[in-house]
UniProtKB/Swiss-Prot annotation:
It comes from Arabidopsis thaliana (Mouse-ear cress). This is Pentatricopeptide repeat-containing protein At2g36240. InterPro entries: Pentatricopeptide_rpt, TPR-like_helical_dom_sf. It holds the Pfam family PPR. Keywords: Repeat. The keyword Chaperone does not apply. Belongs to the PPR family. P subfamily. Gene3D superfamilies: Tetratricopeptide repeat domain. Disulfide bonds: none annotated. PPR repeats lie at residues 156-186, 192-226, 227-261, 262-296, 297-331, 332-366, 367-401, 402-436, 437-471. Coiled coil: none annotated.
Length: 497
């Protein structure tokens, strides 16, 4: 087939219309119902005008160079063209449905399940809901791609499922229900419970719990067994609307029906309780989770800690974490850095250190941020020696500090006449791979100058010289002169060296 302007104009002019059904009118049961009374305003992707233009010529060349001849066109080769040539094209991506429709008009071509599924997903992903509706109408009004004599086929479910999901995400619940009912008739069987869950979740996200519950009840009438996801969706809906009694009733119903709650079920309830200030109920639910043998997740711990801290109960959060540790249910990946930050913010750095050491001792290695936060908290609260001891421990464990935290700690040690301890930390850090900078050396030299330790200071100045940290000889002489006059300067003068 040779592409020309007439072909292109014909293709584009039909870009919004699938070909007429290829079979006589079907019984009403197979027809998709009329759309909801009020059609939403849908923005249709721009198309080429019907008058010849340079764009037509470019599109002709594009099709001639990339689309297989119509006599050899198969669903697989068409899909290859749509995926590799059209899908990400900056100018022609929105013509995929037009090409899809054109192929359906060829006598030698018949779409299969894969091509319908790909087109359904493409239209859904790009929010072309009008075209998606037309595609589903065509599927409903024509025989199954399997055979021209089949109108009911379970393989049609994935085609409709992608559309239902897109409608639910866009809060177009009338269209989602329409597609669901049509799919249910066409597959001549019971849809997968996941499709029911999609519709239930759509109603919940739209804030319509009444319709969500009615659809859940419909599942029972249609003998579709709800799974844990079904209950989690509804529980989440009740929690979002602060109907915790109903959420707990559904939680109990879930267990009565033999559906075991999972970590998402508990997390949803715990988050709901804590966000509404029901601290005791949330913590109680967490301990019930332990009793039922449901594994704690990192998210569970974060929900509990954040909820308690938000209510100003930082000590309770700390105690809860340690209790979970003792019960051996605290996840190894739990990051308690935020709790350390809260404790330090309330001037409880020592409490934070005790908690961290207890966690560390039992295998809960702290992260870099938690360590530096604690060092800063101890330093700012005047507990320089404890900060130094913790810094030494973290470096021995291979956790190296950042230069700002490290230099500030050395400065505080030198200010309290512990320059030797500060230099010992520098040597330890260097042995672990940390590279001291100019600020590190200046802080230590100033500390030794103030304490009258000329020899130690000269060693550091010479190291600076060897590492090219001194910009000129004048700086070197100034530092050495300062060391030679140790004890003769005031503290302010030493800081100026």
């Amino acid at each position: 087939m040779r592409w020309n302007k007439k072909n292109v104009i014909s293709l584009v002019s039909k870009s919004h219309h699938l070909p007429a059904p290829i079979t006589p009118p079907l019984p009403e049961i197979y027809r998709i119902p009329n759309p909801p009374p009020k059609l939403p305003e849908i923005s249709i992707p721009p198309t080429l005008t019907l008058s010849p233009s340079p764009k037509h010529s470019n599109f002709v060349n594009f099709l001639e160079n990339n689309l297989p001849h119509h006599q050899t066109l198969t669903p697989q080769t068409l899909l290859g063209f749509l995926r590799s040539k059209i899908r990400n094209h900056p100018l022609y991506a929105h013509y995929d449905f037009a090409v899809f429709n054109w192929a359906a008009t060829l006598d030698t071509f018949r779409h299969d399940h894969d091509s319908f599924l790909w087109m359904s997903r493409s239209l859904a992903a790009t929010h072309r809901f009008d075209d998606l509706y037309r595609l589903l109408s065509f599927v409903a009004a024509n025989p199954c791609p399997c055979s021209s004599g089949i109108f009911s086929c379970p393989e049609l479910e994935p085609i409709f499922r992608s559309a239902i999901d897109a409608y639910c995400r866009a809060r177009k619940m009338d269209y989602a229900l329409l597609a669901f009912d049509t799919m249910k008739r066409l597959i001549d069987g019971k849809p997968n419970v996941g499709v029911y869950n999609t519709v239930v979740n759509g109603y919940v996200k739209s804030g319509d719990m009444d319709k969500a519950l009615r659809f859940y009840q419909r599942m029972g009438k249609e003998r579709a067994k709800p799974d844990v996801c079904t209950f989690n969706i509804l529980i989440n809906g009740y929690c979002r609307s602060s109907k915790f009694d109903l959420a707990l009733d559904l939680f109990r119903e879930m267990k009565e029906k033999g559906c075991e709650p999972n970590v998402v079920s508990f997390n949803t309830l715990i988050r709901g309780f804590l966000s509404s200030g029901k601290i005791e109920e949330g913590v109680k639910m967490a301990y019930e989770m332990i009793e039922l043998g449901c594994r704690f997740s990192e998210a569970t711990c974060e929900i509990l800690v954040d909820g308690l801290c938000r209510e100003g109960r930082v000590d309770d959060a700390c105690g809860l974490v340690l209790d979970l540790l003792n019960k051996r249910v605290l996840p190894s990946e739990f990051d308690y850095g935020s709790l350390v930050e809260k404790l330090c913010g309330e001037n409880k750095a020592v409490r934070a250190m005790e908690m961290m050491e207890e966690l560390w001792k039992k295998g809960q290695t702290p992260c870099f941020i938690a360590c530096t936060t604690l060092v800063e908290g101890l330093r700012k609260s005047g507990r320089t020696e404890k900060a130094s001891g913790f810094m030494e421990k973290m470096m021995n464990a291979g956790i190296l500090p950042d230069s700002v935290t490290f230099n500030l700690l050395l400065r505080d040690l030198c200010s309290s006449d512990h320059s030797t301890d500060a230099n010992r930390l520098r040597l330890l850090a260097s042995s672990k791979g940390y590279e001291p900078d100019e600020t590190t050396y200046h802080v230590l030299v100033s500390g030794f100058t103030k304490e009258g330790r000329r020899k130690e200071g000269e060693v550091l100045v010479n190291e600076m010289l060897d590492k090219d940290m001194l910009p000129d000889i004048f700086t070197y002489n100034r530092l050495m002169d300062g060391l030679s006059c140790t004890g003769k300067f005031s503290r302010k003068q030493v800081r100026m060296l």
